[in-house]
């Protein structure tokens, strides 16, 4: 019986050594672990006690067309402070008829001399003081659960003589 135990304890070490020898060639599939692959073989990771090495056909590495990675220009990330997501119940939406839209004479368009267009192609927007925004007292907080947004009024700024002067220089 003791000779049988010796054979049993003597046999596993060579198998473990084989596994250790083959492991350096195995890490690339293990490092590229893509959870989107739904193959049952992929989830089987060899355990320390398990000396069975998965077959080459069992471990599936996703092909270039399988995993979709958005292209650099495809994904749009909003600039900090640009997108504001309101918390539920905290959204302030004015009721229809309560929002005072500035009249044509009320909106202050920057003077022709206040807009500078640099030669590099960058557009300098008017400073906060140049455009007059209606104060907070004009809008009312709606009844909770009522979410109708007023239609935005596009403001058009036409380039004045300042741009023509810049082009002439």
Swiss-Prot record:
Induction description: During squamous differentiation of epidermal keratinocytes.
Positions of region (14 X 8 AA approximate tandem repeats): 43-154
GO cellular component, one term: Golgi apparatus
UniProt keyword annotation of Lipid biosynthesis present: no
Location within or outside the cell: Cytoplasm
Spans of repeat Sequence: 43-50, 51-58, 59-66, 67-74, 75-82, 83-90, 91-98, 99-106, 107-114, 115-122, 123-130, 131-138, 139-146, 147-154
A GO MF term: structural molecule activity
A Gene Ontology biological process term: keratinization
Pfam family, one: Cornifin
Residues carrying N-acetylserine: 2
Composition bias type Polar residues, residue spans: 155-169
Biased composition range(s): Low complexity: 1-24
Key words, A-Z: Acetylation, Cytoplasm, Keratinization, Repeat
Protein family membership: Belongs to the cornifin (SPRR) family.
Protein task: Cross-linked envelope protein of keratinocytes.
Name the UniProt record assigns to this protein: Small proline-rich protein 3
Gene: SPRR3
């Amino acid at each position: 019986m003791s000779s049988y135990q010796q054979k049993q304890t003597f046999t596993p070490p060579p198998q473990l050594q084989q596994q250790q020898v083959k492991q350096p060639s195995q890490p690339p599939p293990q490092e590229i672990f893509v959870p989107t692959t739904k193959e049952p073989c992929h989830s089987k990771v060899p355990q320390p006690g398990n000396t069975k090495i998965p077959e080459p056909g069992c471990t599936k590495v996703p092909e270039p067309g399988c995993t979709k990675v958005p292209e650099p220009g495809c994904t749009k990330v909003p600039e900090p402070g640009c997108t504001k997501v309101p918390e539920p119940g905290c959204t302030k939406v004015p009721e229809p008829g309560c929002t005072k839209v500035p009249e044509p004479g009320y909106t202050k368009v920057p003077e022709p001399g206040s807009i500078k267009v640099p030669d590099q192609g960058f557009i300098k927007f008017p400073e906060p003081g140049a455009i007059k925004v209606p104060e907070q007292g004009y809008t009312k907080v709606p009844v909770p659960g009522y979410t109708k947004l007023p239609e935005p009024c596009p403001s058009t700024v036409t380039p004045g003589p300042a741009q023509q002067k810049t082009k002439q220089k």
